Amino acid sequence: MLHTTLSSSIVMAKPRVIYWFRTDLRLHDSPALKAALDLKPEVLYPVWCWDSHYVYRARVGVNRWQFLIDCMNDVSQSITKINKKSQLFVLREPAVTLLPKLFKAWGITHLVFEKDTDAYAKERDAKVMQSAKEAGVEVIVKSGRTLWDSDEVVKANGGKPTMSITQLQNAGAKVGDIEPAVETPKSLPDPGELKLDFDQTQPDAKPDFNEKYRDNDEASYKEGLSGPKNDFHPPTLEELGFKPATTPHKGGESVILKSLDKIIGDEEYTGTFEKPKTSPAAFEPQSTCLTSPYLHFGALSCRYFYHKVEEVVEKRRKAKKSVSDPPASLTGQLLFRDMYFAAQAALGWSFAQTYNNPNCRFIPWHLPSKVDLSTKLITGDYEVDDEEKEKQLQRWAEGRTGFPWIDAIMRQLRQEGWVHHLARHSVACFLTRGGCYISWERGAEVFEELLIDHETACNSGNWQWLACTAFYAQFYRCYSPIAFGKKWDDNGDYIRKYVPELKDLPKKYIFEPHKAPIQDQKKAGVVVQGDGSQAKEGELMTYPKPMLDFNEAREVCIQGMKTGYHVGLYGNSPKVLDGTWKQLFDDAAEGPTEGKQGGPGGLMTFEDADGADEADQHQPDSPQKGKSGAAGSPSKPTRGRKREHSQGTLDFSKSAKK
């Protein structure tokens, strides 16, 4: 009787839950949010911790900030539509110092969030989980950012990074089927009292990697935890010290779901999509789905997207209609994303650099990164080993190389925050192995600042791919800054849009304006001269002369790549780690400009890339220990590999004696 009386008088306290939003700014298909709601909590606090790492230590330009703020406001409005008492509560303090204080102030029993395998996020989350353990708070973490849990993929791949689509697919098959999407919640619990009876911890604002891009002082932490209006809204661009954004792309779950309905509704487009066949020169509208920034911020679930596309593909297959297959298809693009995420999950911080990266070939690029030997991590600074290369980097980043195709891409990127996948290929190849011979890490940093869809895994992976230091090895296939653009846009409409000083040039000269007679230049209202730093010459607009001879530069780069492949070092090779690699290379890292002939494996030609390389991935040789203890020299790349049905062909190949 006593036992019964005691049992009936005990009322189990209901969970009090913080749902920590991060890169999952959506309500649809959120496994972590479902786990939080399955607790049947008494209160649910949807929280965003304003993280100083991204404010100061990551390169984030104004367009990506605006896109993030759009996504935050959108999901907050969606939360409020379901529960008028709730919203996304943005608290202006990093999670590591803030959450332990919230656990106590709000009487929290559970912390729930979506897993993030980025190197920084892993370290941050480990600290938060330790604090939760000490506070007696249960932590629930669910995978939802990728098709498969990246950590599980790594385990299934033998603890190694996935370096090809095939490896990813094989490992994914071992992990299991891609989970179906979970339903969007129809109700949300009330938040509890928002007591903030503790001091705000001010983060260290130095170093500020974004200081040079700000027009005013950064002030997002100066008005307390709940912001200047005490409304828990996201900081504004003005508070971050930026001018208004210039991107036409608006973020938000509601925005992309409407767009996705249109994409999926066009069954032929969805079912037959092949990335290498889409035009990098298309604009208003672009030729692809432009889902990448929404995937990055989690406004769109990759699993939801994947299954929606698969439904269309299966429907077409049953109807005996044509369909595209990975890796060129829409689902193939999601597989590439998972491949890069799993590669990063395996390697951590070193994935985003050459130094100490066991899967990244070492090439003695110009403008190499400085390294903190105590951590084996790059510092964010680099060595200017050649003043001319420093000028080339700045001209490339600002879109004034004198190659209109390259400049149009870089200007679109800076203005809008997004460019087509093959446009990224063009400018990345040009900066690295196909023109300037500048470290891919410099290009990755510029993209980190400018892209609205920047993800460390995909950005670093793509740059290594295009630099032929990992994932892809056919370095003799280069993107011509002239021929490749002409293939897609012979009239130069894309150039006329983004390089308006050339808009009135005749078609004959639009890709090579320096070849136009001076009278044709003046008639078009432009004069080709200088380096592009001077906008006008009298009444005429100016456009720079080419900053290099592409044909000569390409040959020099290919010779340098050939030497680098022959030496066979990787980022973790002892000679790279101790600096003695210099003994193995000529003073001119990219090799002599003449006197040596022949490409890789005796190849006597180079080729213009056609953009089909992702549908044509040849698995690069894995680094292996040689007798010297360094990574051994891999077998040399060869031509003549059998092309599979899904692979592209060289639409624009040409050969030239070296």
Task: Indicate where each model-derived feature is located.
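An acidic- and aromatic-residue-enriched active-site/binding cleft used to recognize and process polar
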Residues: 22-24, 49-51, 93, 116-118, ...
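Active-site-adjacent structural elements in folded domains
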Residues: 274-279, 287-289, 376-379, 387-399, ...
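Active/binding-pocket-proximal capping segment
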Residues: 351, 357-362, 423-472
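Contiguous, well-ordered alpha-helical segments that form the cores/surfaces of helical PPI scaffolds
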Residues: 289-292, 304, 329, 338, ...
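Trp/Phe/Arg-rich N-terminal binding region typifying the photolyase-homology
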Residues: 2-197, 411, 458, 551, ...
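Glycine/tryptophan-enriched, flexible segments
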Residues: 159-379, 489, 493, 497-629, ...
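Long, charge-rich low-complexity segments
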Residues: 401, 466-511
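Glycine-rich phosphate/pyrophosphate-binding loops
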Residues: 37-52, 306, 419, 423-424, ...
